Amino acid sequence: MNRWFVLFAVVLAAGCQSMQSGTISRERIAEIVASPDRSAADRTNDQRRRPEPMLAFIGLRTGMVAMDVSAAGGYTTELIARAVGPTGKVYAQLPRNPQRVEARAKNPAVGHIVPVVRPFDDPVPPEISSNALDLVTLMFNYHDFGHLGVDRARFNRAVFAALKPGGMFVVADHSGRPGTGISESGTLHRIEEAFLRKEVEAAGFELAEEGNFLRNPNDPRDKETPDPPMPKDEFVLKFVKP
């Protein structure tokens, strides 16, 4: 066989594989955020949550199987569902009251959202086998595990077990002052970044990337809402299962 033909076939196959495994483009992310059927409440929330850099930071791919922990009203859940598309799936975990997420899932554009009512200590439903998930997200609620009495070590181990090797665990939260750990979770609703990182890494995760797009170095971090009013200092961490 002609060696140039073989070389061309190898390059073509590699290119196809790259396209299949590649993350969605910034143009596609902009289209997702601008989707006309997104709610007015979500669009208002965009101003604070900055969905475009967040989705780009996560590194989403079409067809991913993900779980959004503490999904609440489903703001992040819906964005991820739009990104992974109908060939993917997004489990929306909540400890109770899944009605708002169930309402979102009625939209055909995000009908692949699966509400899951599970405790934080044991968030992964039995239909998800070990090494099955591509992505787990937890947006601005890890700190709440402190005053809620959640067994955080058990939670982190459960997330680790559910992810595929190479799977990602993306955590965002409100930044606390050095030395405060999780002690201000029920008052200022903040957590020390280094403390969170240490707990997650203890489950076997490795820190892959830090996102700075929600940082505000002018926030003194001594109140729940900064005074004078300003954006909170918030961190975003991407962990990977080796």
Predicted regions and their residues:
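C-terminal motif of bacterial Sec signal peptides marking the signal peptidase cleavage site
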Residues: 13-15
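Bacterial signal peptide processing site
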Residues: 17-19
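Class I SAM-dependent methyltransferase Rossmann-like catalytic core
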Residues: 28-57, 61
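Conserved class I S-adenosyl-L-methionine
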Residues: 63-72
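A short glycine-rich, Lys/Arg-flanked "PGG" loop and its adjoining helix->strand segment in the class I
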Residues: 81-82, 151-165
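A short acidic, Gly/Pro-enriched loop at the edge of an enzyme's catalytic core
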Residues: 125-136
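Conserved beta-strand signature within the Rossmann-like core of class I S-adenosyl-L-methionine
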Residues: 166-175
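Core SAM-dependent methyltransferase catalytic element
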Residues: 219-242
